């Protein structure tokens, strides 16, 4: 009998249906949503997810045992009976963003990998394109800071990341350590000059 290993995904409201290792050595975990309702895309009323499934999407997730890991999900759909023309809405769960190729956890991981590293280095290490790293960076950093969510500004850090190897191509990341110990990105500045 083959040995089994159980690893928590730390993703809520899903059930694991299948796991497989593809021919190119990638771990693909097929999951299904357990959330029964969604908000209508037009009137925002809760509707039942009883209108089938959308097209399958594959999202890059945190590596498991050194393997590139992907979550495959067919999002549930619902049809609003209250709106004119009875539109359908496809479910988007809280652990990924619509049209993102990564889970939120993987985007946060990529942002941490950028500390003391370049985008090109992270791109090579993670087997991702340059634009995928930039996209993860843009998704993780809010355009505007909600200062009500910032609990503590006693510890502020400023770090620079090299966008490319060489000179004159840097961005500055401003972070703050919260009371619970988590690091929050406050801003990404276009360069490291004092005038910014």
Give a label for each model feature.
Residues 58-60, 99-102, 194-196:
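Short, surface-exposed linear segments at secondary-structure transitions and domain or protein termini
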Residues 84-106:
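Short, Lys/Arg-enriched anionic-surface-contact patches
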């Amino acid at each position: 009998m083959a040995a089994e290993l159980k690893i928590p995904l730390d993703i809520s409201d899903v059930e694991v249906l299948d796991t497989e290792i593809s021919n190119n050595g990638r771990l693909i975990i097929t999951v299904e949503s357990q959330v029964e309702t969604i908000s209508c895309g037009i009137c925002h009323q809760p509707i039942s997810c009883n209108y089938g499934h959308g097209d399958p999407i594959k999202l890059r997730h945190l590596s498991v045992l050194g393997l590139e890991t992907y979550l495959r999900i067919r999002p549930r759909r619902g049809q609003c009976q209250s709106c004119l023309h009875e539109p359908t809405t496809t479910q988007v769960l809280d652990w990924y963003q619509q049209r993102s190729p990564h889970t939120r956890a993987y985007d946060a991981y990529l942002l941490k990998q950028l500390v003391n590293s370049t985008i090109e280095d992270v791109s090579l290490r993670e087997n991702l394109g340059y634009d995928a790293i930039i996209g993860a960076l843009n998704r993780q950093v809010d355009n505007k800071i909600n200062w009500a969510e910032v609990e503590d500004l006693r510890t502020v850090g400023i770090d620079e990341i090299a966008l490319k190897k060489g000179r004159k191509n840097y961005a500055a990341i401003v972070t703050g350590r919260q009371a619970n110990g988590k690091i929050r990105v406050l801003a990404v500045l276009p360069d490291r000059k004092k005038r910014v």
